[in-house]
């Protein structure tokens, strides 16, 4: 009895499941290739009837079937696999073709039949012309604005490289900015059955990752341009002193600090040129004001300006000496008037200048101050020696006066700070 699922030739009864010829005019007439090529006729079927080739995909194309030849179905799966997985991914290609083929068999069959075989010789020319055109400009020279000149490597020692986690040959750090940026694409994979929405979503992930890489490189360039790594290691102070040709004023330092957030939008040279031009502008304005002052004083030649400056310096020197002499007399008179209220009291000659100022400001007589000072120092020494003592300050000494005197004695070094 014929097995179910198999097809047989109606003329010779041979199995025709892999490949058979079906008559399009007669019903249930299917012939094997041998009977069809011999022009077999049976019943109402004639050799000149139309026919249809029915391929079951199981007939052998390459090699004898007994020796494991490749069927047409396997060939079709092989071509689909190499289009989907790419040349060289033999493991996935073998799994796609079927469990009966190993990766080694898939590789040997493809190389022998499609590269070194007749198909490869007919499709692949002996000499492949170079169709790639280099449209980039040379990396050096002024006529290459499209390419950035690579930055020189950092001049740091091996120990400093290990401290920073810096790899000079790759110009990378162990911990980069936005360290987890690669997680955006680490799980992406291009599948053969992805729809348009999934493809656009994966492209969006790749675009986000590219923007993160650009931001990482931008920060590297800023750090290299402004020498932030040597500044972190404390090696840029001597270089700055050598590079600067003039002393930076306090106003310029404050302005540099205010403009620091804008450093990322300009190069270091552009910022240095900006401040240098601002300094030149300031010097030019000062020179213009000086020339205008000469003109107001009737000087129209540079030779006359030297005599004018010498006379002006002499005049200012005389005025300064006169003011200095007057201020000295005023200080002496002021000091005498300041101590006039206590200079005739007993104990005034025992006080230092600072103590005289203190007693005058507190309106405290020298004798009372000496008494309070003696009691406070005595109590302090007894406490340091471990002798219990109870402070017995005079009744006329309130809390404000006590605090002022204690602070004064502490600042002068008579007692320690913990005692106050």
Curated annotation (Swiss-Prot):
Chain segments annotated as coiled-coil in the UniProt record: none
UniProt binding sites for Zn(2+) 1: 9, 12, 32, 35
UniProt zinc finger (ZZ-type) residues: 4-59
SMART domains membership: SANT, ZnF_ZZ
Protein residues bound to Zn(2+) 2: 23, 26, 45, 49
SUPFAM superfamilies: Homeodomain-like, RING/U-box
InterPro entries attached to this UniProt entry: ADA2-like_ZZ, Ada2/TADA2, Ada2b_C, Homeodomain-like_sf, SANT/Myb, SANT_dom, TADA2A_B-like_dom, WH-like_DNA-bd_sf
One Pfam short name: ZZ_ADA2
One GO biological process term: chromatin remodeling
Chief location bin: nucleus
Domain named SANT: residues: 65-118
MF GO annotations: chromatin binding; transcription coactivator activity; zinc ion binding
Listed PROSITE patterns: SANT, ZF_ZZ_1, ZF_ZZ_2
Keyword Transcription applies: yes
Signal peptide: none
Localization per record: Nucleus
Keyword field contains Nucleus: yes
A GO-annotated cellular component: SAGA-type complex
This protein's UniProt keywords: Metal-binding, Nucleus, Transcription, Transcription regulation, Zinc, Zinc-finger
Region feature (Disordered): 305-335
Biological role: Coactivates PAX5-dependent transcription together with either SMARCA4 or GCN5L2.
Subunit structure: Interacts with GCN5L2, SMARCA4, SMARCE1 and PAX5. Component of the TFTC-HAT complex.
PANTHER family (alphabetical): TRANSCRIPTIONAL ADAPTER 2-BETA, TRANSCRIPTIONAL ADAPTOR 2 ADA2 -RELATED
Name of the protein: Transcriptional adapter 2-beta
Organism of origin: Homo sapiens (Human)
Gene encoding the protein: TADA2B
């Amino acid at each position: 009895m014929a097995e179910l699922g198999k097809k047989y030739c109606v003329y010779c009864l041979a199995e025709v499941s892999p490949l058979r010829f079906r008559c399009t005019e007669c019903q249930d007439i299917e012939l094997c290739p041998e009977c069809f090529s011999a022009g077999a006729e049976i019943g109402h079927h004639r050799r000149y009837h139309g026919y249809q080739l029915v391929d079951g995909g199981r007939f052998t194309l390459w090699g004898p079937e007994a020796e494991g030849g490749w069927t047409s179905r396997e060939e079709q799966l092989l071509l689909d696999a190499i289009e989907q997985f790419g040349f060289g991914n033999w493991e996935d290609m073998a799994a796609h073709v079927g469990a009966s083929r190993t990766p080694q068999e898939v590789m040997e069959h493809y190389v022998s039949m499609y590269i070194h075989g007749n198909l490869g010789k007919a499709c692949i020319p002996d000499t492949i012309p170079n169709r790639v055109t280099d449209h980039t400009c040379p990396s050096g020279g002024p006529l290459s604005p499209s390419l950035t000149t690579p930055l020189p490597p950092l001049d740091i020692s091996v120990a400093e490289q290990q401290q920073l986690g810096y790899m000079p040959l790759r110009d990378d750090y162990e911990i980069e900015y936005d360290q987890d940026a690669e997680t955006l694409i680490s799980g992406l994979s291009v599948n053969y059955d992805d729809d348009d929405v999934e493809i656009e979503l994966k492209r969006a992930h790749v675009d986000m990752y590219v923007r993160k890489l650009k931001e990482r490189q931008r920060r590297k360039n800023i750090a290299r341009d402004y020498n932030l790594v040597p500044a972190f290691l404390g090696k840029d102070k001597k270089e700055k002193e050598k590079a600067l040709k003039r002393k930076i004023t306090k106003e310029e330092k404050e302005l540099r600090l205010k403009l620091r957030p804008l450093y990322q939008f300009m190069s270091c040279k552009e910022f240095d040129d900006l401040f240098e031009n601002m300094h030149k502008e300031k010097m030019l304005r000062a020179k213009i004001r000086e020339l205008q002052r000469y003109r107001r004083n009737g000087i129209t030649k540079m030779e006359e300006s030297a005599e004018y400056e010498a006379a002006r310096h002499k005049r200012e020197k005389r005025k300064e000496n006169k003011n200095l002499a007057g201020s000295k007399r005023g200080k002496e008179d002021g000091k005498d008037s300041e101590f006039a209220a206590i200079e005739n009291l007993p104990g005034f000659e025992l006080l230092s200048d600072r103590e005289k100022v203190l007693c005058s400001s507190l309106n405290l007589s020298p004798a009372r101050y000496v008494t309070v000072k003696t009691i406070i120092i005595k109590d302090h020494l007894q406490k340091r020696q471990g002798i219990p003592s109870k402070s017995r300050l005079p009744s006329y000494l309130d809390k404000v006066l006590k605090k002022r005197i204690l602070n004064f004695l502490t600042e002068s070094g008579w007692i320690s700070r913990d005692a106050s």
